[in-house]
């Protein structure tokens, strides 16, 4: 994977959130516009601010379009096209408590998978400031932590 792009309503707010919650620092913050960009992204008159944040071997791209747009995210996790970004953690209970202390908006406390191929793994979903779903995930104790 090269990167995962997430469209946000306020780039500065999102940069502050991802730094505060997960320690992600921008590699760069820049702007984009013009006919080539508009054609490439399928948005007439596209004008945007965006940033790349390094996450392990990949990158999270945060994009804020200045175009007429819908500023509410209406997809539920069960809706086709609904993404989520997952962060691997070594201790989910500690990560959950730390993120709660920073104001994270979790769907629930961590859940441990009882059976199947992910038996023993734990996860919890949370929302970023735009309502995009994030996840923290702890590998089962008998599986290597990546």
Predicted regions and their residues:
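Short alpha-helical patches at coil-to-helix transitions and adjacent helical residues
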Residues: 1, 8-11, 89
